[in-house]
């Protein structure tokens, strides 16, 4: 769910939707065609500049927080029933086993012919960008606004907000 308001004489809805579709196509775990879904399903994926920018930012934040923020935590999240799989609470042995799947070191990065490819080092590890994707989507739509030299706008996606200027009200 998103809401965008801006002061401009043209309708930018199609451009906004196109930008949001790009973000969804990279980071949505609910989109069966997304890059992150392909990665999580065990495929080697070609990483776009957008994907690499968000991955690199996520790695930096993980490092800065000593691992408190980690986009590889999906197996643990799922074990507690917050993700796609709902099951009973994991016991300590399951938690210890799943913790081995968590960590940025489990992402294999290969550069070939000027392209970047990502794959898993461990079969059951997963990426989950849900902590950053909505904010990144808000920033991406804000970039559309700036590209059109729009000074006054508000972009809100799932509670993540990007603003500039003043309200028309």
Walk through the language-model features, giving the residues of each:
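A contiguous, well-ordered beta/alpha segment that forms the leading edge of an enzyme domain
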Residues: 1-130, 143-153
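Short active-site segment of divalent metal-dependent hydrolases/proteases
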Residues: 137
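Conserved residues at the C-terminal ends of beta-strands
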Residues: 156
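Penicillin-binding protein/beta-lactamase superfamily catalytic region
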Residues: 140
């Amino acid at each position: 769910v998103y809401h965008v308001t801006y002061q401009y004489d043209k309708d930018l809805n199609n451009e906004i939707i196109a930008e949001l579709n790009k973000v969804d196509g990279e980071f949505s775990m609910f989109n069966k065609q997304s890059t992150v879904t392909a990665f999580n399903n065990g495929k080697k994926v070609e990483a776009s500049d957008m994907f690499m920018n968000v991955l690199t930012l996520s790695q930096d934040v993980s490092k800065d927080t000593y691992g408190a923020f980690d986009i590889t935590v999906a197996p643990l999240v799922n074990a507690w029933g917050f993700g796609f799989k709902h099951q009973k609470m994991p016991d300590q042995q399951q938690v210890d086993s799943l913790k081995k799947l968590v960590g940025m070191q489990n992402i294999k990065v290969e550069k070939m012919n000027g392209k970047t490819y990502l794959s898993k080092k461990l079969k059951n590890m997963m990426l989950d960008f849900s902590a950053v994707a909505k904010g990144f989507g808000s920033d991406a739509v804000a970039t559309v606004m700036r590209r059109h030299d729009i000074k006054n706008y508000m972009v809100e996606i799932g509670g993540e907000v990007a603003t500039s200027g003043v309200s028309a009200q």
